[in-house]
Regions:
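Signature of dsDNA virion morphogenesis modules
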Residues: 1-184
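Terminal short linear interaction segments
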Residues: 180-199
Length: 199
């Protein structure tokens, strides 16, 4: 591993996106099935800086989604509304085929997706390895320019239909973070200056 690469945070991350790329599948027996994109290489602003999910071959481990993937509502582990039938990587995006359950809670969300009221999609994922890229520098493969943290190895573990999306490049996509509110960098810079003046 190069000096620029570090073992990433062990905490769980989420990204939400909004797009018109959630599509109902056609044909008999597919009434509750949709295809969607759930992640891309679109830069995403975290409170610590810009994060980019690498979608190169081998960067994304889709094993867990393909084996036991679930469809949630707003990342709520108690709101399982369906299952992931298959997930795949294509054209620097992750896609999935999902199927909604038929219980009462799932039916409400299914109808809202079907009618176009809900268009937001989000992915919950864990990071294995990142490459830190300083401002004006490029990644080792020349693909991305800093400042950014490029997530080189990561694995998604759930897909969510979300109410409030933040990234408009995928869909049903990315959503506004519930836990990590985005604070402008100026706030942190001011706090650093205050701390320097009081020490």
């Amino acid at each position: 591993m190069s000096p620029a690469q570090t073992e990433a945070r062990s905490n769980i991350q989420q990204r939400e996106m909004a797009t018109a790329t959630i599509r109902a599948m056609e044909g008999e027996g597919n009434e509750r099935r949709f295809t969607l994109s759930f992640s891309s290489e679109e830069p995403y602003e975290r409170f610590w800086g810009i994060e980019i999910l690498d979608h190169s071959e081998g960067a994304v481990d889709l094993t867990r989604l393909n084996e036991i993937g679930v469809l949630l509502f707003n990342h709520d582990r108690d709101a399982v509304i369906g299952k992931v039938l298959r997930a795949w990587l294509e054209n620097n995006r992750c896609h999935a085929e999902v199927e909604f359950d038929s219980d009462e809670q799932s039916e409400i969300i299914y109808q809202k997706v079907r009618s176009g009221t809900l268009k937001g999609v989000s992915v919950g994922y864990r990071i294995d390895t990142i490459e830190e890229v300083m401002a004006g520098k490029t990644t080792a493969d020349g693909k991305f320019t800093g400042p950014a943290e490029v997530v080189r190895k990561w694995w998604p573990y759930e897909i969510s239909i979300v109410s409030i999306p933040a990234d408009s490049t995928v869909g049903v996509g990315r959503a506004i973070e519930k836990i990590n509110c985005r604070t402008p960098i100026e706030v942190y810079e001011r706090q650093l200056q205050i701390n320097k003046n009081t020490i």
